[in-house]
Amino acid sequence: MTIAKMIDHTALKPDTTKEQILALTKEAREYGFASVCVNPTWVKLSAEQLAGAESVVCTVIGFPLGANTPEVKAFEVKDAIQNGAKEVDMVINIGALKDKDDELVERDIRAVVDAAKGKALVKVIIETCLLTDEEKVRACEIAVKAGTDFVKTSTGFSTGGATAEDIALMRKTVGPNIGVKASGGVRTKEDVEKMIEAGATRIGASAGVAIVSGEKPAKPDNY
């Protein structure tokens, strides 16, 4: 598999414009990225632009704080699928995890998994920068129990992004059959190679073109 096919080509800034989404989807077609990862408002346009392409549309759920209710997250998933999303990246209820309310964390994830079942792949963002190692392990274990397809490090909107150490811990926790996505601060081919070596099977990056072409990113982002 090429590096491009492991990358979710990402544009999640709040001020993203239509012109930028059109450029993102054009690049996805050209380079063969796994997906474009966009905010829900851009799902329909992105799906139209990628009709017939190998790249699919990924969107974010309960993003970036994860503090919506399970019911709201489930609705977001259904709406996104209706608009053409094939993958959804949800943020866990981080406060509930900190409170050791594992039942709520699981119910929250399961609401998304159930809403997406058979229609969209689910990635669970645990926001590693806010967690202890014990909490990272617990979050991954709960996500697997709830039926996720992937666990993912970061939103790119908090205090830190992906590290090889966190990827290795997540991979060790979920085993070989669940995907692990590194996201947040992955900007170069070298960054990607480190993450893959640590166990990542998907990369979230706004610098996708620079990564596959070897060029320097025009403007570094946190995701």
Swiss-Prot record:
<dbReference type="GO" id="GO:0006018">
    <property type="term" value="P:2-deoxyribose 1-phosphate catabolic process"/>
</dbReference>
<dbReference type="Pfam" id="PF01791">
    <property type="entry name" value="DeoC"/>
</dbReference>
<keyword id="KW-0963">Cytoplasm</keyword>
<comment type="similarity">
    <text>Belongs to the DeoC/FbaB aldolase family. DeoC type 1 subfamily.</text>
</comment>
<dbReference type="GO" id="GO:0005737">
    <property type="term" value="C:cytoplasm"/>
</dbReference>
<feature type="active site" description="Proton donor/acceptor">
    <location>
        <position position="181"/>
    </location>
</feature>
<dbReference type="GO" id="GO:0009264">
    <property type="term" value="P:deoxyribonucleotide catabolic process"/>
</dbReference>
<dbReference type="InterPro" id="IPR011343">
    <property type="entry name" value="DeoC"/>
</dbReference>
<dbReference type="GO" id="GO:0016052">
    <property type="term" value="P:carbohydrate catabolic process"/>
</dbReference>
<dbReference type="InterPro" id="IPR013785">
    <property type="entry name" value="Aldolase_TIM"/>
</dbReference>
<dbReference type="InterPro" id="IPR028581">
    <property type="entry name" value="DeoC_typeI"/>
</dbReference>
<feature type="active site" description="Schiff-base intermediate with acetaldehyde">
    <location>
        <position position="152"/>
    </location>
</feature>
<comment type="pathway">
    <text>Carbohydrate degradation; 2-deoxy-D-ribose 1-phosphate degradation; D-glyceraldehyde 3-phosphate and acetaldehyde from 2-deoxy-alpha-D-ribose 1-phosphate: step 2/2.</text>
</comment>
<keyword id="KW-0456">Lyase</keyword>
<feature type="active site" description="Proton donor/acceptor">
    <location>
        <position position="89"/>
    </location>
</feature>
<protein>
    <recommendedName>
        <fullName>Deoxyribose-phosphate aldolase</fullName>
        <ecNumber>4.1.2.4</ecNumber>
    </recommendedName>
</protein>
<dbReference type="GO" id="GO:0004139">
    <property type="term" value="F:deoxyribose-phosphate aldolase activity"/>
</dbReference>
<dbReference type="InterPro" id="IPR002915">
    <property type="entry name" value="DeoC/FbaB/LacD_aldolase"/>
</dbReference>
<comment type="function">
    <text>Catalyzes a reversible aldol reaction between acetaldehyde and D-glyceraldehyde 3-phosphate to generate 2-deoxy-D-ribose 5-phosphate.</text>
</comment>
<keyword id="KW-0704">Schiff base</keyword>
